[in-house]
Each structure stands twice: as C-alpha cells, then as structure tokens.
C-alpha cells in the first residue's frame, strides 16, 4: 500500500480523528459520496474569491453578514486563494502545488500582508486554532520580515469572528509540534480506527473493524 507523502491541515485533522478513515480516504482512495456541507463551503469560497478578484461587483447574499468587511478586503487589495507548497525542510517551492517534492500544501482564503482571513461556512471548532497557527507559521517562514501574524476566522453563517495572534518567538516550538504530529501520521502502518462522535456519519463505517455491521 502506497504511503501518503504530503499533508495539509485537513489531512492531519482527518488522521487524528480516525486513522482508519484517513487510510481509506488518502491511501486506499475509496471514493467519497457528495457532501452538502462540502458543496456549500466550496460555493461560498468560489463566490468570495470571484468578488475579491473583481469578477462580481457586489458581495453576494452568501457573504451578507460580512458585506462591509469584504468590501474593505477588496478595497485594500487582498490576495484571494493564495497557495503555498513547502518541502520537508519547510522550504517554499514556488508554483510547486504538483511538485514531486511537495510535503505541505495550504491555501489562504485572503491575505493583506501579515493579516490572514479564513472563511468558514460551518461553526467554530477549537481545532481552528491549530489551523490558524499553521497558516501563521508558514507565513513567517516564507516572509522573514513578518514577526507578528494576525489570523481571523469569519464564520459566514453566524457572523462570528475569531482572532488569533502569533509571534515569531514561538515558531521553533510550533515547527517541532507539527513535525511530531506529522511523523506519527506518515509512519503509521496500523491505521487503527478511533470511535468518535462522527462515526454515525462515516461513509466507510460498514468496513470499519470497530463499527462494521452496525
């Protein structure tokens, strides 16, 4: 079985939620059914990107709880859907999304210098702090002049905003934190299932060693 040699925040979250499901999705590549929540999220991100690119004149309805904020992003020239690819030495690979050396991939929904914004169509989860930290860590690595990074999460349905601030003094410890978690994922050979609150929605539960047949 071919191992997965690259990661993203969502991939790592999937593994830590359930290693068996991670194996099914990322290694065995068992096709996933269509998800209403995923489709909704992709649509909102596409609309936001096209508005910031000037292809849509006014913020569409799906963004209406943040109309003023989106107008300000556009006015200030925010970069939408900015992609970054790093190798396993945490070095930037320019235009490297499909590179054979790609180790970490991420996309920022919007950025103005050291101010980053992520758009969410779901609710707030504590794990979003880790996502914010990863974005800030990568931004510090690719922009050595940035010592402080502010990351905001805009929850498009509720209008809620979460703000996180990061400083370069923590970068070394943060990198060690990521490497420890990623090494565990990439060196796993067992992929043991982890029963959790999401099992009842899991599309591979019928073949799960724990949940199969339920």
Tell me the role of every PLM-derived stretch.
Residues 2-4, 20-32, 114-117, 179-189:
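Short amphipathic alpha-helical segments and their helix-coil junctions
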Residues 5-56, 81-82:
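Nuclease catalytic cores
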Residues 6-7, 80-82, 87-94, 100-101, ...:
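Metal-dependent nuclease catalytic regions and adjoining charged, substrate-binding loops involved
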Residues 26-28, 36-38, 59-61, 76-83, ...:
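Short coil/turn segments at secondary-structure boundaries
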Residues 30-36, 123-124, 189-192:
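Short, polar/flexible loop-turn hinges at active-site or ligand-entry regions and domain interfaces
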Residues 43, 130-138:
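Short amphipathic alpha-helical face segments that pack within enzyme cores
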Residues 47-116, 123-130, 144-152:
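Catalytic cores of nuclease domains that cleave nucleic-acid phosphodiester backbones
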Residues 116-119, 161-163:
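Short small-residue beta-strand/loop micro-motif enriched in glycine and branched aliphatics
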């Amino acid at each position: 079985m071919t191992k997965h040699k690259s990661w993203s925040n969502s991939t790592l979250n999937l593994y830590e939620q359930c290693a068996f499901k991670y194996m099914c999705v990322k290694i065995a590549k068992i096709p996933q059914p269509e998800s209403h929540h995923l489709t909704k999220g992709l649509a909102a991100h596409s609309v936001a990107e096209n508005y910031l690119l000037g292809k849509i004149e006014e913020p569409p309805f799906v963004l209406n709880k943040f109309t003023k904020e989106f107008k300000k992003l556009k006015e200030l020239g925010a970069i939408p859907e900015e992609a970054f690819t790093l190798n396993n030495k945490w070095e930037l690979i320019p235009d490297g999304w499909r590179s054979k050396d790609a180790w970490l991939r991420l996309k920022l929904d919007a950025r103005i210098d050291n101010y980053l914004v992520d758009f969410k169509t779901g609710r707030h989860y504590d794990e979003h702090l880790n996502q914010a930290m990863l974005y800030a860590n990568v931004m510090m690595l690719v922009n050595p002049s940035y010592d402080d990074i502010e990351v905001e999460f805009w929850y498009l349905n509720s209008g809620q905003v979460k703000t996180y601030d990061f400083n370069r003094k923590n970068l070394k410890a943060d990198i060690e934190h990521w490497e420890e978690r990623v090494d565990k994922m990439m060196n796993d050979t067992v992929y043991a299932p982890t029963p959790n609150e999401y099992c009842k929605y899991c599309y591979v539960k019928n073949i799960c060693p724990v949940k199969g047949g339920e």
